[in-house]
Each structure stands twice: as C-alpha cells, then as structure tokens.
Curated annotation (Swiss-Prot):
It comes from Herminiimonas arsenicoxydans. Part of the 30S ribosomal subunit. Contacts proteins S9 and S11. This is Small ribosomal subunit protein uS7. GO terms for cellular component: small ribosomal subunit. One of its GO terms (molecular function) is tRNA binding. The lineage of its organism: Bacteria, Pseudomonadati, Pseudomonadota, Betaproteobacteria, Burkholderiales.
C-alpha cells in the first residue's frame, strides 16, 4: 500500500466549441507532441464531415460511437504456480472510456481515406452503427474474456 496520500483526479475543462468534457478528453487522446490545436482541428473537421455526410448531430454520433466501443470485460495475465493464465476481469468505468477512445483513434489511423478528419468521421459513423475497426477490437477483447471464462476464479 502506498504511504502517501491519494492524488486527486484532475478535472478536464470542456472543449470550447461544444462544451463537452468527452470531446475535450478525445482531443487529448488524439493530440501528438502537445499540438492541441491540431487535434482540435482534426476533431472539428471530422464533426463537419459527419454533419455533411449523414446529416446527423455530430455530438450524438460521437457519444453513440464511444458508448458502443466501451468494453465490459478484458483479460489480464495472472501467474499461478508457474503458469500464466488470462483471467477475465471487469473494466472500470474510467478505463472503459479510455480504451474506447484509444481504439477509435487507432482504427481511424488504419483507415484508407485521405485526411485524418475524413478517417475519423468514417470510423465514428461506423462505430455509432456498431461496425468498424474499433468495434472489431472490442468484440475481440470480449471473445478473449469469454474463451478464458474458466479462469475467472483466479480473481485479482
């Protein structure tokens, strides 16, 4: 157990355009080398693409995409008697959010569209409809947890 006091979580300020904390978090996930304005431009560009492509509210698409990509369970390695077991564990809410955002970013990076705003818009639209690379990743993690259900008694 740590002897020091627990460090409080910092509050993230909502993003300037939409006033949404989740969008601000996603800006931070997307940001490279501290270039926040570039990350903001990518996200706002993606939101414009979503608006023109589908005619839906970009914030609703964004929240639906994140909600759909959140994993419920994942596997963690646990060493028991000289053997490593993949033990399924429930994912904490903060980590759920972080994983879904990370998977959306990685899936958007792997897409073939020309610019990052277009790739991100495509991935968000697909994830909102429960398909796409990020959803594939979530389903893969769920499958791993399901396959290793027998080891769930090795709790952490």
């Amino acid at each position: 157990m740590p002897r020091r006091r627990e460090v409080p979580k910092r509050d993230i300020l909502p993003d300037p355009k939409f006033g949404n904390v989740d969008v601000a978090k996603f800006v931070n996930v997307l940001m490279l080398s501290g270039k926040k304005s570039v990350a903001e431009n990518i996200i706002y560009g993606a939101f414009e693409h979503i608006q023109t492509k589908s005619g839906k509210d970009p914030l609703e698409v964004f929240t639906a995409a994140i909600l759909n990509c959140k994993p419920l369970v994942e596997v963690k390695s646990r060493r028991v008697g000289g053997a490593n077991y993949q033990v399924p564990v429930e994912v904490r809410p903060v980590r759920r959010m972080a994983l879904s955002m990370r998977w959306l970013r990685e899936a958007a990076n792997k897409r073939s569209e020309k610019s990052m705003p277009q790739r991100l818009a495509g991935e968000l639209l697909e994830a909102a409809e429960s398909r796409g690379g990020a959803m594939k990743k979530r389903d893969e993690v769920h499958r791993m947890a399901e396959a290793n259900k027998a080891f769930s008694h090795f709790r952490f």
